[in-house]
Amino acid sequence: MKEIEFDLLTEPWIRVRLKDNTVQEVSLTEALVSAQDYVDLAGEMPTQDAAVLRLLLAVLFTVFSRVNVEGEPEPLEKRGQALRRWSELWQLGHFPAEPIRDYLEQWKDRFWLFHPTHPFWQVPEAKIGTEYSAAMLNGEMIESKNKPRLFPLYAGQSKEQLSYPQAARWLLSVNSFDTP
Protein backbone atom coordinates (compact mmCIF):
# COMPACT_ATOMS: atom_id res chain seq x y z
CA MET A 1 0.00 0.00 0.00
CA LYS A 2 1.44 3.33 -1.06
CA GLU A 3 -1.28 5.72 0.07
CA ILE A 4 -2.05 7.11 3.48
CA GLU A 5 -5.78 7.25 3.98
CA PHE A 6 -8.49 7.71 6.63
CA ASP A 7 -7.18 9.43 9.75
CA LEU A 8 -8.90 7.86 12.77
CA LEU A 9 -8.02 10.89 14.89
CA THR A 10 -10.04 13.34 12.78
CA GLU A 11 -12.44 11.29 10.61
CA PRO A 12 -15.73 10.20 12.19
CA TRP A 13 -15.89 6.41 12.73
CA ILE A 14 -16.79 5.65 16.36
CA ARG A 15 -20.55 5.30 16.78
CA VAL A 16 -21.87 7.01 19.92
CA ARG A 17 -25.35 7.45 21.35
CA LEU A 18 -26.22 11.02 22.29
CA LYS A 19 -28.46 12.07 25.19
CA ASP A 20 -31.43 12.44 22.82
CA ASN A 21 -30.90 8.76 21.84
CA THR A 22 -29.64 9.54 18.33
CA VAL A 23 -26.54 7.78 17.03
CA GLN A 24 -23.66 9.72 15.52
CA GLU A 25 -20.17 8.87 14.27
CA VAL A 26 -17.29 10.80 15.82
CA SER A 27 -13.51 10.72 15.52
CA LEU A 28 -11.28 9.10 18.12
CA THR A 29 -10.21 12.52 19.39
CA GLU A 30 -13.80 13.74 19.61
CA ALA A 31 -14.92 10.56 21.41
CA LEU A 32 -12.33 11.20 24.12
CA VAL A 33 -12.56 14.96 24.60
CA SER A 34 -16.38 15.02 24.46
CA ALA A 35 -17.06 11.74 26.28
CA GLN A 36 -19.30 13.55 28.77
CA ASP A 37 -21.75 14.30 25.94
CA TYR A 38 -22.39 10.64 25.10
CA VAL A 39 -24.60 8.10 26.80
CA ASP A 40 -23.05 4.99 25.29
CA LEU A 41 -21.12 3.51 22.42
CA ALA A 42 -23.46 2.40 19.64
CA GLY A 43 -21.54 0.07 17.34
CA GLU A 44 -23.06 -2.72 15.31
CA MET A 45 -22.63 -5.28 18.13
CA PRO A 46 -21.86 -5.16 21.88
CA THR A 47 -18.54 -6.93 21.29
CA GLN A 48 -17.60 -4.18 18.85
CA ASP A 49 -18.41 -1.59 21.52
CA ALA A 50 -16.18 -3.47 23.98
CA ALA A 51 -13.31 -3.45 21.48
CA VAL A 52 -13.69 0.30 20.85
CA LEU A 53 -13.94 0.95 24.59
CA ARG A 54 -10.72 -0.97 25.08
CA LEU A 55 -8.93 1.40 22.67
CA LEU A 56 -10.45 4.49 24.32
CA LEU A 57 -9.41 3.29 27.77
CA ALA A 58 -5.89 2.49 26.58
CA VAL A 59 -5.44 6.09 25.43
CA LEU A 60 -6.91 7.50 28.65
CA PHE A 61 -4.85 5.23 30.91
CA THR A 62 -1.68 6.13 29.03
CA VAL A 63 -2.33 9.88 29.07
CA PHE A 64 -3.44 10.17 32.69
CA SER A 65 -0.74 7.88 34.03
CA ARG A 66 1.76 10.45 32.76
CA VAL A 67 0.07 13.80 33.42
CA ASN A 68 -2.24 15.13 36.12
CA VAL A 69 -5.68 16.69 35.67
CA GLU A 70 -4.08 20.05 34.81
CA GLY A 71 -2.00 18.40 32.09
CA GLU A 72 1.27 18.83 33.98
CA PRO A 73 3.78 15.95 33.91
CA GLU A 74 3.25 13.84 37.03
CA PRO A 75 3.80 10.12 36.46
CA LEU A 76 1.90 7.76 38.73
CA GLU A 77 4.15 5.83 41.06
CA LYS A 78 1.75 4.34 43.61
CA ARG A 79 -1.70 2.80 43.47
CA GLY A 80 -3.16 5.47 45.74
CA GLN A 81 -2.06 8.16 43.30
CA ALA A 82 -3.95 6.44 40.49
CA LEU A 83 -7.13 6.26 42.54
CA ARG A 84 -6.85 9.95 43.46
CA ARG A 85 -6.16 10.95 39.86
CA TRP A 86 -9.20 9.08 38.53
CA SER A 87 -11.29 10.53 41.36
CA GLU A 88 -10.16 14.02 40.32
CA LEU A 89 -11.07 13.27 36.70
CA TRP A 90 -14.50 12.05 37.82
CA GLN A 91 -15.05 15.23 39.87
CA LEU A 92 -13.98 17.34 36.90
CA GLY A 93 -16.82 15.83 34.84
CA HIS A 94 -14.85 15.61 31.60
CA PHE A 95 -11.43 14.62 30.34
CA PRO A 96 -9.04 17.56 29.85
CA ALA A 97 -8.65 17.95 26.09
CA GLU A 98 -5.12 19.29 25.87
CA PRO A 99 -3.22 16.29 27.31
CA ILE A 100 -5.27 13.94 25.13
CA ARG A 101 -4.65 16.00 22.00
CA ASP A 102 -0.93 16.27 22.82
CA TYR A 103 -0.58 12.51 23.22
CA LEU A 104 -2.53 11.71 20.05
CA GLU A 105 -0.53 14.30 18.10
CA GLN A 106 2.67 12.58 19.21
CA TRP A 107 1.44 9.28 17.72
CA LYS A 108 -0.68 10.58 14.83
CA ASP A 109 1.18 8.58 12.18
CA ARG A 110 -0.06 5.37 13.89
CA PHE A 111 -3.73 6.24 13.50
CA TRP A 112 -4.14 5.97 9.73
CA LEU A 113 -6.37 3.07 8.70
CA PHE A 114 -4.29 2.72 5.53
CA HIS A 115 -0.58 3.46 5.74
CA PRO A 116 2.40 1.89 3.93
CA THR A 117 4.43 1.22 7.09
CA HIS A 118 2.13 1.78 10.10
CA PRO A 119 -1.47 0.84 9.28
CA PHE A 120 -3.68 1.10 12.36
CA TRP A 121 -3.96 -2.13 14.37
CA GLN A 122 -2.32 -4.11 11.53
CA VAL A 123 1.06 -5.57 10.59
CA PRO A 124 1.90 -4.65 6.97
CA GLU A 125 4.72 -7.21 6.78
CA ALA A 126 2.40 -10.12 7.61
CA LYS A 127 2.32 -12.21 4.46
CA ILE A 128 1.19 -15.40 6.18
CA GLY A 129 -2.45 -16.36 5.89
CA THR A 130 -5.23 -16.23 3.39
CA GLU A 131 -6.68 -13.17 1.72
CA TYR A 132 -10.35 -12.62 2.45
CA SER A 133 -13.00 -10.20 1.28
CA ALA A 134 -14.42 -7.43 3.44
CA ALA A 135 -17.29 -9.76 4.32
CA MET A 136 -14.95 -11.76 6.55
CA LEU A 137 -14.15 -8.64 8.57
CA ASN A 138 -17.82 -7.82 9.13
CA GLY A 139 -19.04 -9.62 12.26
CA GLU A 140 -22.65 -9.22 11.18
CA MET A 141 -22.15 -11.35 8.07
CA ILE A 142 -21.09 -14.76 9.35
CA GLU A 143 -21.86 -16.80 6.28
CA SER A 144 -19.94 -18.81 3.75
CA LYS A 145 -20.31 -19.46 0.03
CA ASN A 146 -22.09 -22.74 0.69
CA LYS A 147 -24.13 -21.61 3.72
CA PRO A 148 -25.79 -18.25 3.11
CA ARG A 149 -27.54 -16.54 5.99
CA LEU A 150 -31.33 -16.92 6.03
CA PHE A 151 -32.21 -13.31 6.92
CA PRO A 152 -29.08 -11.32 6.01
CA LEU A 153 -28.46 -7.76 7.11
CA TYR A 154 -26.50 -7.17 3.92
CA ALA A 155 -27.24 -8.32 0.39
CA GLY A 156 -25.68 -8.06 -3.06
CA GLN A 157 -22.64 -5.83 -3.43
CA SER A 158 -22.96 -4.45 0.11
CA LYS A 159 -21.93 -7.89 1.38
CA GLU A 160 -18.48 -7.42 -0.14
CA GLN A 161 -17.94 -3.78 0.80
CA LEU A 162 -17.34 -1.86 4.00
CA SER A 163 -17.07 1.87 4.47
CA TYR A 164 -13.84 3.06 6.10
CA PRO A 165 -15.64 3.75 9.41
CA GLN A 166 -17.12 0.23 9.39
CA ALA A 167 -13.75 -1.28 8.51
CA ALA A 168 -12.07 0.51 11.43
CA ARG A 169 -14.71 -0.67 13.92
CA TRP A 170 -14.68 -4.26 12.66
CA LEU A 171 -10.87 -4.32 12.58
CA LEU A 172 -10.83 -3.58 16.31
CA SER A 173 -13.58 -6.10 16.95
CA VAL A 174 -12.02 -8.93 14.96
CA ASN A 175 -8.61 -8.38 16.53
CA SER A 176 -10.16 -8.36 20.00
CA PHE A 177 -12.50 -11.32 19.75
CA ASP A 178 -11.75 -13.50 16.71
CA THR A 179 -9.55 -16.41 17.71
CA PRO A 180 -7.47 -18.46 15.28
PLM regions and their residue ranges:
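Conserved small-residue
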Residues: M1-Y154, S158-P180
